Amino acid sequence: MQVLGMEEKPARRSVVLVPFPAQGHISPMMQLAKTLHLKGFSITVVQTKFNYFSPSDDFTHDFQFVTIPESLPESDFKNLGPIQFLFKLNKECKVSFKDCLGQLVLQQSNEISCVIYDEFMYFAEAAAKECKLPNIIFSTTSATAFACRSVFDKLYANNVQAPLKETKGQQEELVPEFYPLRYKDFPVSRFASLESIMEVYRNTVDKRTASSVIINTASCLESSSLSFLQQQQLQIPVYPIGPLHMVASAPTSLLEENKSCIEWLNKQKVNSVIYISMGSIALMEINEIMEVASGLAASNQHFLWVIRPGSIPGSEWIESMPEEFSKMVLDRGYIVKWAPQKEVLSHPAVGGFWSHCGWNSTLESIGQGVPMICRPFSGDQKVNARYLECVWKIGIQVEGELDRGVVERAVKRLMVDEEGEEMRKRAFSLKEQLRASVKSGGSSHNSLEEFVHFIRTL
């Protein structure tokens, strides 16, 4: 929406960004950094020592990276779990970020226009307020997941939380006003109690003194959720400016990418390979991996499988897998520790993506017209999986325990059956809509222009 009656102020060219230290949050924040830099802003990124992102040569002129001290050992993430780690991180960083921001205000040659913080780094709001700087929330999840978090408190207050943790039948019930989401799809976590999750969500969706919210999504994907947030929940401007990976590329992988898989893909037929990657956090037990391997072998489809180091509990990588694992995967498969995902999804050989359905992976897959097998792990992934299957109709959700038969049937449905071909057609249509949205005159392009104008008038 255009802000009328305001004139842009000169010399407000610096923006401070505060990413959450996880791969799925760092990537879109750095894409936002590149996007705003292209619009004429100098960028200061304030990071924690935990999961520190080491900037490449892509981030040089007009980019500054500052690290704030915190005393969180690497082991805390595993020992505490993501939710308790989040609480501790926000508590640890509150004072150090305020001191850092105060120094930046004194040192910056360009006046700071605003502080943009990841919704999970909510400690940044108080410091921005104290330094008399406008602050803006950046949601790296879907608008629908953000909307779900925004009503969580109301559900909890009305004692509607029972279906979120009670019997299977109740969990299957549809959530009023959030069709087609079921209670079981709401973004809860297997890592913490419902009460702890409630506290996180109260903090992440509390706009406090925020001037606006920006979301890495597009109107063509989530128009109803965006309208709900804008008109009923937030009452401040909401800017859908994504998918950001289609606006500005930014190399941000915390793990080394094995690009040999591209050479392997070059030898495969069009739409003949299913790509399997469960993201940067999800874990799989050995028995689950064996069932997946067995199902893949039975499907007779070629596959590129990312098995992340440390993703198998009790094992560094696949060295502890039974001997039959290698026999099942070597014939038609290729396994890497980490892959250049955007390059993989854009490869003509890839016809499907088995994913945990993190929002970045979801956007990247839709952006390349690749349908998905959905195996959500936690949090907003379940929301995304439900939308992929029931709203956009380009996904097959695999629920419950994994066994060879379930895996084989899902892969064949996507890669062999007519159903999968229809999904590819719908995915291609969504891909074209997303590409149009980020081009001049498109909805995300216009929203980005309005957002840039907005922060120049603050």
Swiss-Prot record:
Report residues binding UDP-alpha-D-glucose: 140, 339, 341, 356, 359-361, 364, 380-381
Name the UniProt key words of this record, in alphabetical order. Answer: Glycosyltransferase, Transferase
The record lists the catalysed reaction(s) as: a flavonol + UDP-alpha-D-glucose = a flavonol 3-O-beta-D-glucoside + UDP + H(+); a 7-O-hydroxy-flavonol + UDP-alpha-D-glucose = a flavonol 7-O-beta-D-glucoside + UDP + H(+)
Q: Which GO terms describe its molecular function?
A: flavonol 3-O-glucosyltransferase activity; flavonol 7-O-beta-glucosyltransferase activity; quercetin 3-O-glucosyltransferase activity; quercetin 7-O-glucosyltransferase activity
> Which top-level group of life is the source organism from?
Eukaryota
This chain's function reads: Possesses quercetin 3-O-glucosyltransferase and 7-O-glucosyltransferase activities in vitro.
Q: What name is this protein filed under?
A: Flavonol 3-O-glucosyltransferase UGT76E12
Origin organism is: Arabidopsis thaliana
